[in-house]
């Protein structure tokens, strides 16, 4: 994955994790998963609800937070 992709994903997912924001994650096959982001890395997201699920990022279509989240992206690194 490109570094630019990580510049957007990491701050967004980290804000959702730190603020314990409930999310809906839509997979490319249309399935909707709900829970809180427990952790993430370059390839997977750990989603916690009644159980913890490891969701591969390549299977994720959309991440929808239950509320607005402020996250900082370093503009100086984008070009």
UniProtKB/Swiss-Prot annotation:
Q: Which InterPro entries match?
A: Hfq (IPR005001), LSM_dom_sf (IPR010920), Sm (IPR047575)
Q: Domain Sm spans what residues?
A: 10-69
GO CC field: cytosol
Keyword terms? RNA-binding, Stress response
**From its record, what is one biological process in GO terms?**
regulation of DNA-templated transcription
GO molecular function annotation = RNA binding
Q: Which Pfam families match?
A: Hfq
Assembly: Homohexamer.
Q: Which family does it belong to?
A: Belongs to the Hfq family.
- By what name is this protein known? RNA-binding protein Hfq
Instruction: Give the gene that encodes this protein.
Output: hfq
């Amino acid at each position: 994955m490109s570094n630019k992709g990580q510049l957007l994903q990491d701050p967004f997912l980290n804000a959702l994790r730190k603020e314990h924001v409930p999310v809906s994650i839509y997979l490319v096959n249309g399935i909707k998963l709900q829970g809180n982001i427990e952790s993430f890395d370059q390839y997977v997201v750990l989603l916690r609800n009644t159980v913890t699920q490891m969701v591969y990022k390549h299977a994720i279509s959309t991440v929808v937070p239950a509320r607005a989240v402020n996250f900082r992206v370093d503009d100086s690194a984008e070009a």
